[in-house]
Amino acid sequence: MLIIRNKQELKEVILKQKQANKTIGFVPTMGFLHEGHMTLVSHARKESDFVVMSVFVNPTQFGPNEDFDAYPRDEAHDAKLAEEGGVDILFVPTVEEIYPTELSTKLHVDKRVSVLDGADREGHFDGVVTVLTKLFHLVSPDNAYFGQKDAQQVAVVSGLVEDYFFPVNLRIIATVREADGLAKSSRNVYLTEKERKEAPVIHEALQLGRKLIESGETNQAKIVQMMTEKINEQTSHELIAYLAIYSYPEFTPVTDWSKGIIIAAAVKYSKARLIDNELINVKRR
């Protein structure tokens, strides 16, 4: 496995692979890798000739009061897991390598971001599409791999790819969970012992919402109330950042319960904000 920090060196290696007609699979991450990331790598390894993983904590997707400086980082750990998983290139650029100067052209996401994380984290998705635009140009992937846990991000990135004709196939992989149902996340390390015991209730509440919808319930307020009560069995209502149901991938009010629907939750603990979701009537790509 090559560890590359320079974008010019990355482009040269990618060009050689392209000239050899190799398909490239790309797994963009912010590092502190866990089983969820490695599941994406496993799919990339099976479906691509050459696998590139990026580890870059992107400052433009963090708000002024968010955890950019505190976000967990462990390059040695990441490199070990990446090599064991069969990654060919681990791209680990500095902030200066990706953002050498102040941007003269800025991307702004208009749709699919007025609710949930888009509303809760102003400017977050602008930063996501900005860094992915840069990375897609550098890596030129045939396939790019994302997890369903970040479903709103997936919808936004799908819009980016469609709007700007990126020649990349997005592969959306099911959320990887702990044995008790908690979605694997780099932020789980921030949980206290008590919070870690409580956190699986997020997934339990989402499963309850799915069960109600699939049984024919269409009273959205009732569904959300029952999910809220489920979470409140383990934690306090004040910790719920959002618990909502929208059409997917549009993130608009549900008008047709037979089409794509997302049930989404975000819960704030003392040092971690955890998100999770359930998708209904949605096929992963």
UniProtKB/Swiss-Prot annotation:
Catalytic class of the enzyme: ligase
Residues the record marks as active site: 37
This enzyme's EC code(s): 6.3.2.1
Catalytic activity: (R)-pantoate + beta-alanine + ATP = (R)-pantothenate + AMP + diphosphate + H(+)
Subunit (UniProt): Homodimer.
Miscellaneous comment in the UniProt entry for this protein: The reaction proceeds by a bi uni uni bi ping pong mechanism.
Descriptive protein name: Pantothenate synthetase
Species of origin: Listeria monocytogenes serovar 1/2a (strain ATCC BAA-679 / EGD-e)
